[in-house]
Regions:
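Extracellular glycan-modifying ectodomains
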Residues: 2-537
């Protein structure tokens, strides 16, 4: 009996050792008999993730090329050496090029958007806002919609003077002038914006223009287009669902408003040549916002195609309505048009061209007024979309300045006392332009930081010219000079103040190094003056 118990005990210990051994074996990595099912979803997700990330490399390996399906120019592949010098921006440029051109980019963008749209009801692109009822909005318009980062009072004062200078310059030449702002889509259809975007309770751009713009050249499009949108409601929209622009119905409405205003000064304007009320609807429009979300197969929507009572022709071959310069001619009108415009006028060209004998449409910046010499211009229209209004403060129009002959202003300036100063400004540009000779200068920080109007006098000739309160962004070499000589930080260069002035070749001849000049500056409705000498010219 004792022996039996001992043997039983021995067998029990052996069994225990065997079980422990099995347990140790089963807990060692790679030796489990079965893969746990609870880890299967993670494995599938990880595999798909790495497969998707590998698609661009796999596509490149087999020679697949990605087609540009977006409505923009993609970044070009950079070179390591440019102009026999190392390209120090190569890595940054390469990143931009690869981001724009990697294989399967359109398909991956579309997939990402669909995932976000279906799971979270948001856009898959930081540039697109998904609104109500499948409406899409351009994210670059959010500041305008929310009334954030609006133009300051000083910027509005400068803008008012910029528009006034162009209006007066054209009036002296017998040319009518219309300045108008194409509304952002969410300014016309705010009811389709997401609920979480709440505009501030401050004046919008229309109210700001009405309050502060001195020139009567401004034409309000916001109010009548908003009224039209509200009256038609869902029967006929005037902006695209999936595009940031108005559709042809909205463009026709804008054209009617513009031409009614123009006919006040041009009574024989054949407005009847505008398209009639008959139209055809085709579901063939690919909106720019839809292309951003799905470049490979963007959603299409309805476009309204209107008939026309007249014809026109292009004076030169046109690739698309996005061309920088487009010229048309018609045998119907007797007036000539110059229009500085952006992409919102793409749809206006078909509507305005039959109304004018000659029409020139320019998308170039800065606006070049030497184009009026190409035809006997009767009307200049400046159209710019609401979201880009700030560009008018960055690019001074190219137009030869006239000497000031306003006796009231000359008398007012003659009473302003001035003091001598030096090293208060530096010329950053001294080049020939289509208008003659362009000079541009930056004021040293702390001098005339709130300048609204700037007038330059050359004592040697007694002539006075009003300059634009605009400085274009300095190039790299000038920026280095400013940071070195004046100790200005790079981050503040874009906020500097100054002026730009276009002079005739004859007037520019007296602008020499150390030439004495007097600068009159209006700040807070008060004139100041300083005598100085041209430096850095």
């Amino acid at each position: 009996m004792r022996q039996y118990k001992q043997e039983k005990s021995v067998h029990s210990e052996e069994n225990t050792n065997i079980e422990n051994s099995r347990s140790r074996i089963n807990t060692q990595p790679g030796l489990q008999r079965h893969f746990p099912l609870r880890k299967l979803p993670a494995l599938i997700y990880s595999s798909l993730f790495f497969l998707i990330c590998s698609l661009p490399l796999l596509g490149a390996a087999v020679g697949i090329k990605s087609e540009n399906l977006e409505k923009r120019t993609l970044a070009a592949k950079p070179d390591l050496i440019t102009e026999n010098k190392p390209n120090w921006q190569y890595t940054e440029q390469f990143d931009s090029w690869y981001t724009d051109n990697f294989i399967f980019r359109p398909q991956l963008i579309a997939g990402w958007h669909n995932l976000n749209q279906n799971l979270f009801n948001v856009s898959g692109s930081e540039r697109v806002v998904a609104g109500k009822n499948n409406w899409l909005f351009f994210a670059d318009t959010l500041d305008d919609y929310l009334k954030q980062n609006q133009l300051t009072d000083l910027e509005m004062a400068r803008l008012s003077n910029i528009i006034r200078l162009q209006d007066e310059w054209l009036a002296r030449r017998g040319i009518d002038y219309i300045f108008t702002i194409a509304p952002n889509k969410n300014s016309i259809y705010p009811e389709y914006m997401p609920e979480n975007y709440k505009p501030a309770e401050v004046p919008d751009i229309t109210e700001l223009m009405r309050q502060q713009l001195e020139s009567d050249a401004w034409l309000d499009l916001h109010t009548p287009l908003r009224e039209t949108a509200q009256s038609r409601q869902q029967a006929e929209y005037i902006y695209h669902f999936t595009d940031s622009h108005w559709n042809n119905t909205g463009a026709l409405t804008a054209a009617q408003i513009i031409l009614r205003r123009a006919s006040d000064k041009l009574p024989e304007l054949p407005i009847e040549n505008l398209p009639g009320s008959d139209f055809e609807i085709r579901q063939d429009w690919q909106g720019d916002l839809a292309v951003m979300l799905d470049p490979s197969s963007p959603q299409t929507e309805n476009q309204y195609y209107y008939g026309t009572n007249s014809t026109y022709r292009f004076k030169r071959p046109v690739r698309s309505m996005e061309d920088i310069l487009i010229e048309t001619t018609s045998n119907q009108g007797e007036y000539n048009l110059l229009m500085f415009r952006d992409s919102f006028a793409n749809a206006l060209i078909d509507m305005l061209s039959p109304v004018f004998k000659e029409a020139i449409y320019s998308r170039a910046l800065p606006h070049d007024y030497s184009l009026i010499e190409k035809a006997d211009i009767d009307l200049v229209i400046l159209e710019i979309v609401e979201r880009n209004l700030g560009l008018l403060l960055e690019y001074a129009p190219v137009m030869t300045a006239d000497t000031i002959e306003d006796q009231k202003l000359l008398f007012e300036l003659a009473a302003v006392e001035y003091s001598e100063a030096s090293d208060i400004f530096y010329f950053i540009e001294n080049t020939k332009s289509s208008a003659g000779h362009r000079v541009s200068a930056i004021f040293k920080p702390g001098h005339f930081d709130e300048s609204e109007r700037i007038i330059i006098e050359l004592p040697s000739t007694g002539q006075l010219y009003e300059a634009y309160p605009i400085i274009e962004r300095p190039d790299e070499e000038t920026s280095k000079m400013l940071t070195g000589n004046w100790g200005i930080e790079n981050s503040t260069i874009d906020s500097l103040n100054g002026f730009t002035l276009d002079l005739s070749e004859e007037s520019a001849g007296v602008w020499q190094q150390n030439q004495e000049i007097i600068i009159y500056v209006q700040q807070n409705n008060h004139w100041e003056a300083v005598g100085t000498r041209i430096q850095g010219f």
